[in-house]
Amino acid sequence: GERLWYAVSNNFKENTRHLPLNSDTTGSFQVVDPSGSIIPNVIAVIIAPGPPLQRLNAGSVQDRSPGGENNPANYLDETASEDNAEFLENTSNGFISGIVRDPLGRILVNDTMTVITYDDLMRMLEKQVATTVLNCLTSYAAYNVGGINNFGRYPWAVEMSAPATPPYIDTPNTVFGRVPTLLTNTNLTAPNMLSAWGSIPSCTITHNWFQNNWREHVFYAIADAYKPGSVAPSCPMCLKVGPINNVQVVVMVGRKTLPGQNRTNKTVIANYLEGENATPYDGIFVSSAISSTFNDLLVFK
């Protein structure tokens, strides 16, 4: 078979990287399927060329000899509105998947494609981010080495009104907020508790992948019974997620911006979280299917 071709959205390419890359990063081109339906928000395509044909505005059949093998027009096809060899981001000239014929039955496009959309990637990525943060928190709570024993307790969060510039220090007496980089105030509240994540090698949330991309989108809440300085952590002083009681800690990802949310103001919870999750201090949270008014992702213990 012919060599495969690949295109990736500028927002998702590796070199140079677009920052940030998170739930609000969208694909920048579209694909038209053989029926004429548009697949929007595409982040990458893998294209398998069909047999050589004469492109719409070409004078001869595609040349796939060694001399023409690096010219995409010798492999990829076009219609009057889409050119697979010369696509443009953020325009209607994206990609078109074959088979496509003209009114006389002549094949215009015989390229076939595998499409990767925003939803294909971002749902997995968001789940990985949430799980990583939860694992950091539970590993922290379980830490017991030498004179440091966290006794099953979790660190203070960073309050919503904290500056959006480093260092991101935990805020005293804050059981809901963003993820801190430094746990200074947790250690001041309970000197036997860790003051940093560095003693947990598996925890990477202080690294650039999280700090540059996800820090503003991820939140957590801890049950009052599991806050720093509490004694003998136990329920019933715990959180609730839907019908599930006795929850110690909840991690939430504010997914793609919904209508009415304005994330230039990063201090308002409702600009990131919806429903019960936007009123976190009552200890009641909800995990539900994605809709036009709700798209929070929750993981918890």
Outline where the language-model segments fall.
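N-terminal pilin/flagellin-like segments and related low-complexity appendage regions
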Residues: 2-301
